């Protein structure tokens, strides 16, 4: 159903047909800017979506247009509490666990992304739960469960520009808790001879605990990775693209629980 919304939003700006052909997408985009079209770009995951606009006036147009479209075409009502216009130059917006803000850098605005406060609270709660489990049963399996959790949140949030600052703070907040709980059951220090998976994913300069022969992944050791646009070649449905898809999946999943 919401695919109709995707196509409609794109048709209002990105795929709007122009009378005269242009040699490049940039030329066509500049031509559209000289019209009265609503410039906007849809970002959607399931039923959670945002439309990015250049200014408040355009955002007002989009807000009312989308509200009417959902009401008339899809028979859906928007929530006034959840659906609002946010000036990213002045305050943050939240999307899929991330915070987004447009910060000034020289003469331009750049996206500054972090982790939603509620999500950080849940990360700390889950980390404490897993550490308590290791304390009560210091087995390799429980250590691997903790590593799987750390690797998962690192992989998801490493797209945030502030991910290193956010996780450094999380590690600082949890440091005393982890140390006091694991000191009686583990060995603390820099990994002397970590396994290949640890070397591939993390640096040996961070102190961590060794539990039943397994080094725990350090929470603070993560850095931002640029988010690239989706490539149509990343599909398993053609022979050539299927090879790329398989290799990509292998890189992602290889050694997640091995330490």
Kindly give the residue locations of the regions a language model identified:
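Non-catalytic terminal/accessory segments
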Residues: 1-259
């Amino acid at each position: 159903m919401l695919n109709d919304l995707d196509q409609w939003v794109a048709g209002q700006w990105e795929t709007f047909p122009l009378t005269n052909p242009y040699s490049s997408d940039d030329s066509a985009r500049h031509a559209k800017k000289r019209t009265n079209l609503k410039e906007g770009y849809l970002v959607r995951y399931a039923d959670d979506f945002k439309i990015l606009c250049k200014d408040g006036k355009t955002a007002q147009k989009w807000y009312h247009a989308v509200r009417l479209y959902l009401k008339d075409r899809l028979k859906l009502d928007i929530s006034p509490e959840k659906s609002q216009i946010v000036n990213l130059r002045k305050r943050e917006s939240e999307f899929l666990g991330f915070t987004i803000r447009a910060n000034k850098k020289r003469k331009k605005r750049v996206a500054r992304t972090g982790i939603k406060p509620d999500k950080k609270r849940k990360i700390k709660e889950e980390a404490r739960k897993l550490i308590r489990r290791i304390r009560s049963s210091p087995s390799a399996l429980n250590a691997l469960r903790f590593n799987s959790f750390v690797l998962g949140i690192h992989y998801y949030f490493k797209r945030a520009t502030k991910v290193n600052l956010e996780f450094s703070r999380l590690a600082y907040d949890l440091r005393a808790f982890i140390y006091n709980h694991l000191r009686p059951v583990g060995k603390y220090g820099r990994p002397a001879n970590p396994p290949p998976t640890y070397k591939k994913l993390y640096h040996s300069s961070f102190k961590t605990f060794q539990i039943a022969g397994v080094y725990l992944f350090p929470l603070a050791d993560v850095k931002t990775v640029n988010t690239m646009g989706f490539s149509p070649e990343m599909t398993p449905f053609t022979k050539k693209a299927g090879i790329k898809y398989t290799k990509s999946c292998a890189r992602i999943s290889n050694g997640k629980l091995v330490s």
